[in-house]
Amino acid sequence: MINKNLDANTYSKMANAIRVLTIDAVEAANSGHPGMPMGMADVATLLFSEFLKFDPKNPKWVDRDRFVLSAGHGSMLIYALLYLTGYSDISLDEIKNFRQFGSKTAGHPEYGEIDGVETTTGPLGQGFANAVGMAMAERQLSAKFGKEIVDHNTYCIVGDGCLMEGISHEAASLAGHQRLGKLIVLFDDNGISIDGSTDLTVSDDHIERFKAYGWHTASADGHDFNAVRSVISQAKDSSKPSFLAFKTQIGFGSPNKGGTAACHGAPLGADEIELVRSTLNWSEEPFVIPESIIVAWRKLGEKGGKEEKAWQERLKQLENGQKQSFKNTIKAELNSNVLNALHTKIFCIVVDTMKSSIGCFYVGTVL
């Protein structure tokens, strides 16, 4: 999705809406992680405005782009984005009930609770590996049914913690080997962890590490919309998976706590929030977003709706047999032969039967 009708000033206001919703929700809950959403708000705003293909009115659209927040502790980033773009599954009341018992807006995003959350991301690095799997699935489906039907990207936001986890190393190696060019990882390179500077815990050169895995790599200022646009555009043109390191300030907009571990995993406090509002030139009451900013965000989803309708027309053009095969593959329903095989046959027979039923199927063994 390309939408270049908005200027940097409008983007800044849209990003600030993410920031104030974040600090208000975390403050109300007296718990949460405001720093990452505040720091990555500019990158996320540009991504959703100009690149991400999505339709809030049909969140299960098969050919939507996938957006995975692997750094799930910064969950207010995705909750704010889904609310602002018009997903009906998340209301302002849910934002106000952030991290409360029984609320959809848990401290870490949970799959199945809110449309638009593609996978549960609690353990760091898990979302990264999930995103690799999603990109593998996209390529296999596209090869079978054609780019007119399956042609989408997978975007994944990660932090330093995700990249420290062993699972990210294994998944990154696999993605590079598979040359998953539709996978774009956005690294929040803020140099801060919960304990302080990341120098205390890690000294990896992440860019060189991902180059060694066979990835396309780039770095940019995460608060410069033109720079963000440039590197994402280059990533979309690459035949390799892309690792984009965005230098950001954790807690961007917070005069006293921004750039420090103090805003990583704790509320900013009432006094600092007032200073943030002043710094961002934001005069609204807590949880109030100006109508003009809401309208700007909601328009993004309207274009996605048009793309989804065009896709539906292409789907209708498939031959009946191919169309039914596509629907069966997406449903991934197992027939009775599979269930019988699970009880009576050895592993290979089970796999062969599942493959004949589902059509698109990955399996691996360690012997």
State what each model feature region is.
Residues P56-K57, E113-I114, T119-K299:
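Glycine-rich ThDP/TPP pyrophosphate-binding loop and its adjacent helix/strand module
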Residues M1-T154, V295-L367:
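Thiamine diphosphate
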